[in-house]
């Protein structure tokens, strides 16, 4: 289990102040909220319209925004911590930020329960042309979950070169995401 940062206390205040829920814990652990967003961005929706692929993406609070230990191990070294995708477009809106924080705290407090819930949601929404991206705004090794769902196609981008090189799961397309700061790792 990850240690939560003091910032998570600020997030809990934001949750309380921005919802009609009386009890923060009920709000935080309410399972009526989806973990995955389906066809939720313009680029992904365009793929759905043109290729008829349904894409589910998991967005968490990345780097060390909620946890004392980062969910993006290469964020600082790669120089992508501050200009992170987490604040672009709709993800930068307050509701999206709160949803990412809620999911992240759920994952950090109960990783096994979170993975079970995620697996159930993936299977419940399965379609013919279907793919899942678990690291929409994080860089977590999900290979155990992905390996347990061999009939589902997954894809991700990672700044962890070793993970990209060692990936041997046939249902997981992992692209190494180079940046100016980590180009030397390719050489």
Model-derived segments and spans:
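Class I S-adenosyl-L-methionine
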Residues: 1-187
């Amino acid at each position: 289990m990850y240690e939560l940062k003091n910032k998570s206390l600020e997030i809990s205040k934001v949750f309380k102040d921005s919802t009609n829920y009386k009890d923060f814990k009920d709000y935080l652990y309410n399972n009526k909220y989806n973990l995955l967003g389906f066809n939720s961005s313009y680029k992904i929706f365009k793929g759905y319209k043109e290729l008829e692929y349904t894409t589910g993406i998991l967005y968490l609070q990345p780097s060390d925004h909620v946890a004392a230990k980062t969910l993006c191990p290469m964020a600082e070294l790669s120089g992508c911590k501050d200009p992170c995708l987490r604040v672009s477009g709709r993800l930068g809106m307050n509701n999206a930020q709160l949803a990412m924080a809620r999911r992240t705290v759920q994952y950090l407090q109960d990783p096994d329960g979170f993975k079970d819930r995620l697996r159930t949601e993936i299977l419940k929404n399965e379609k013919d042309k279907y793919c899942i991206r678990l690291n929409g705004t994080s860089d977590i090794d999900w290979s155990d979950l992905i390996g347990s769902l061999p009939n589902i196609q997954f894809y991700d981008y990672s700044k962890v070169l070793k993970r990209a090189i060692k990936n041997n799961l046939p249902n997981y397309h992992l692209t190494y995401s180079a940046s100016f700061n980590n180009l030397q790792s390719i050489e």
